[in-house]
Amino acid sequence: MNIEEFISSLAEKGISLSDRQLEQFELYYRMLVEWNEKMNLTSITEKKDVYLKHFYDSITAAFYIDFEKVTTLCDVGAGAGFPSLPIKICFPHLHVTIVDSLNKRITFLETLSDALQLEHTSFVHDRAETFGQRKDVRESFDLVTARAVARLSVLSELCLPLAKKNGVFAALKAAAADEELKAGQKAIKVLGGELEQVHSFTLPVEESERNIMIIRKTKSTPKKYPRKPGTPNKSPIEG
């Protein structure tokens, strides 16, 4: 996806980018590639691929979520900042919190955020399991996102405790196997959520499958969740 395709594909969805925003994406790309030589941030480094598989792919969440109605966003395990920072560039009013367990990645994100002059961004070096038990952040976010390979049952335990009542957890997945959704239903219910919709589509250019699962937080998460670090992965709420 070249820059022109990036601009026109987003414009078709009602997202028009200013010169300033395009400069921010360009700098994001350059810093990602530069820092990637020092640490493992991504295996995708070709410019056209970064714009499609990282930037555009992250922004697809805005095709199904009205970000004008979102103020606070928490991104769990965002790695190199996906999906939250491309979304933040498009919607500057957002207050974004990123939680990541690797300090090196947090250092990259802080440096990147300063270079892009992003306001209202905070980066927390913590495990999602511990962060989700913090009284000052638990059940406080309008939207919680995760673009990760972990199973839906595991992601739900890490993310739903952070969403406020009537807030949303959005899981961005490459492919949504029906069995993963079925296996995740119990966790979603136990944690106070309800599957609202699964949006399935293909990325332009390469036509690869993408799914965005929208889970609405309908009631408070029981206090014991998330369980201690490592437990959600070892024994997910399934069955």
UniProtKB/Swiss-Prot annotation:
CC per GO annotation: cytosol
How would you classify this enzyme at the top EC level? transferase
The molecular function terms in GO held by this entry are:
rRNA (guanine-N7-)-methyltransferase activity
Respond yes or no to whether keyword Methyltransferase is given for this record: yes
Q: Respond yes or no to whether keyword GTP-binding is given for this record.
A: no
Q: Which UniProt keywords apply?
A: Cytoplasm, Methyltransferase, rRNA processing, S-adenosyl-L-methionine, Transferase
- Compartments reported by the entry: Cytoplasm
Q: What is its EC number?
A: 2.1.1.-
| Classification via Pfam families | GidB
Composition-biased stretches (Basic residues): 216-227
Predominant subcellular localization, coarse grouping = cytoplasm
Q: Which residues bind S-adenosyl-L-methionine?
A: 77, 82, 128-129, 147
Disordered: region residues? 215-239
Provide the function of this protein: Specifically methylates the N7 position of guanine in position 535 of 16S rRNA.
Q: What is this protein called?
A: Ribosomal RNA small subunit methyltransferase G
Taxonomic path: Bacteria, Bacillati, Bacillota, Bacilli, Bacillales
